[in-house]
Amino acid sequence: FVFSLGSGAISWSSKKQPTVALSSTEAEYRGAAVAACEAVWLKRILKDLGVPIKDPTSLYCDNMSSIYLARNPVFHARTKHIEVHYHFIRERVLAGDVDLQHISTNLQTADIFTKALGADKLWQFMTDLGLTIPDLPSLRGSTEDTTQ
C-alpha cells in the first residue's frame, strides 16, 4: 500500500504475507486489511496534530471479490479459514472509517513496490507518488576539471 497527502507519499509498505493465501481474493483482502489499519493510524496521528479528517479514507483495491468480501458482513464457508484479525477491514468499512473502492490494475500505484514494471508505467507511478530522480552528476560530483 501507499498513502499520499498532497502531492507526495507519506506512508507505504510492501511485505511478504506471513501465511500462504489460498486465492488472489484472500491475498488482496489481507493486504486491504493491513492498509485499513494504517489508514486508521494515520487518521489518529492527523487528529493529534489538529487536522481531524471526518470523511472516510478511500482505499483502492483492484480485486472486486475482496471488496465484496469486505463490504459483506456475512461469513461464508469459503472464508472461514481467513484469520479473524484480517476481518478488521469489515469493521472499519461498516463503521464508515474506510471506503473501499475498485481501481483498475493499470492505475494501482502501489504496484511500483511489488511488480516489475515497464519504463512508461514506472515513470507514471513515480510521478504519481511525487518521486524524482536527482541529476546523476550532482550525486557523483563533477568529473570535469574546474581549475582552468
Give names to the regions the model predicted.
Residues 1-7:
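Acidic, metal-ligating active-site segments
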Residues 15-148:
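RNase H-like nuclease module associated with reverse transcription
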Residues 8-10, 22:
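Short, well-ordered secondary-structure "scaffold" segments embedded in the functional core
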